[in-house]
Amino acid sequence: MRFRNPVRRALRYVLVDRHRAELRAHVEEARALEKLGAEQTAEMQRQRLARVLTHAAVHVPYYRDLLPQYGVLDASGNARPERLAELPFLDKATLAEQFDRLRSDDADARDWVVNRSGGSTGEPTRFVQDRGYRAWAEAVKVVRDAWAGIRPGDRRALLWGSARDLFEGREAWKTRLRRWSLNQLWINAFYASEEAMASHLAQLRRFQPTYLLGYAPNLHELALFAERCSTRVPSLRSIASGAGTLYPHMRDDIERGFGAPVFNRYGSREFGAIAGDCELRMGLHVAAPHVIVEVIRPDGSRADPYESGEIVVTSLTNFSMPLIRYRIGDRGATSDRRCACGCGWPLLDRVEGRMTDTFVHPEGGIVSPTGLIHLAGALVREGWIRRFQFVQESVEEVTIRIVPEGETATAAERHGDATSELTQAVQEMMGPRSRVRIQFVESILPSASGKHLSTICKVKPSPGATLR
């Protein structure tokens, strides 16, 4: 299946490979760095961070002013990477306000482009990324793919939904040729009716991919549909969840529905590949040559291993716009285990989803709706819920939107006991003051980035609010 067509090989060279000498060098380096032990990996990251900080202090106006205030530079102007935790965080508002001052004054020599986030939680965020960053982001993806048994050129199908990446009928001919040359099939995850999912499965069976990448909720829904229809895609060797939170019950359902192992991936527009499962799936290996990941408490201190907190990321490869201690907007936890696979890159124990996925408790603090999602997931497996969404409308009001199987108009009568169980679960989590409304709907629209959001909170938590 790998580039046997000479026309495909030639087209890949014209559109892709002739520009990728830098990528190939980075892939070789990343494969060597993957073999480092934990202590050697930490030293490698320290050296790479020192280069980023030294560059930022000289060439990035924002950091030229900021870094000397926090003792990150010694008397000779050399960076002190061990002082990283003393630097203030960079948030999306500051990135927008200081965009020009965050861009390096030597960026024009680095072949930079402006990229944007998907905007699932509001307006998309702009940032600059250069050729070196792009090559490194792709290189760590190649290493990560190898953990899942995927090689460059293997047939890949992508169940994707970002309007920026995929919109039927509007792709340029060069984009289509590029995807054909790369052995890729793109399927629009925006379309999720039963007719659309039957079409998706038919396309997959015709294309015979060895690898399927998609949004976790969309993969989950398609896998359940495939199971109901007794339809398999026998060519699949592995599946990757590339966006959205992959909950344990979802992983189990996807593996059962498609008959292939699921690998969890964590990344973003700002940083590309951040972390991912290896073949042992003991946690997500952070892409150590590419990023540093911290998990912080509400007071800004670093969380202990396995303690839930806010994820903060520092780029080690984007010199045109270094994002240092960037609040990416997600929750998760680190791990102190050393993976038996032999890779010394640090582990994330889990990624819990967006910071905005948490709910505000009427009596103070924030609560994680993970238990609700597990409960709703069990009802999905019972076969009467197609899709669900929990929305906190106010401090004391939660709406549960449900797309049922069968007639929407009669769903409340048919499933009263199950909805009572959901209502009770919300009230136990949110307290006796909470009011819960069940709303049966025909469909639930995805976010602007194409993701199905299982939870939405319209209430702003108090500063420093902690998990209850």
Question: What function would you assign to each model-found segment?
Answer:
Residues 1-116, 122-138, 142-155, 162, ...:
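Nucleotide 5′-phosphate-binding alpha/beta core
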Residues 51, 162-289:
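Conserved adenylate-forming
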Residues 156, 184, 262, 293, ...:
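Generic structural signal for residues in well-ordered beta-strands
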Residues 157-159, 312:
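Short, well-ordered beta-strand segments
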Residues 212, 317-432:
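AMP-binding/adenylate-forming catalytic core of the ANL superfamily
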Residues 246-338, 355:
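Conserved AMP-binding/adenylate-forming
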